[in-house]
Amino acid sequence: MAFEKEFHRNLRLTLREKREHLKGAITIWMFEDGRLVGETYGTPLDGKDEIPDGCPKDSHSIYCDSTTILRKYKNKGYGKILKAAFIGRVSQDFRRIYGHARPGASQALNHGFGARLGKTYKNWYGTGEDYRIYDLIIHNR
């Protein structure tokens, strides 16, 4: 649950919630010298799970719930590596990635991979931050 500490309290999942959510997710954990550095996971937008705000029900799309690097390892390029790994993995089965990104590094990271930033969601889940939806078309076919 180390990653939950990186989130605003309103966005944190309990261990039970996270276990249940990850059952239907594609998940990648990143390690450096055996130490956990980052995690990313996404859930298909096929309607089996709740569809996040602004996303379509589309079996060819996936929602990237999180790409998180632990604070100690931030600003070392790990986020870009992990996001690239996620895109590579999901490109086998999906044509588009959706997500909601925080202002700053998260939006820049996704935009850097070619994501189109869309609607702003003010005060996302009471965090005090304005998140933007993004979508990234995967050119794999």
Task: Describe the predicted segments one by one.
Residues K5-D33, G47:
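Active-site rim helix/loop that mediates acceptor-substrate recognition in acyltransferases
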Residues G34-G38:
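Glycine-rich acetyl-CoA-binding "A-motif" of GNAT/NAT acetyltransferases
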Residues I69, N75-G88:
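Conserved acetyl-CoA-binding loop-helix of GNAT-fold acetyltransferases
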Residues E39-S66, K74, W124-G128:
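Conserved acyl-donor/pantetheine-binding loop and adjacent beta-alpha core of acyl/acetyltransferases
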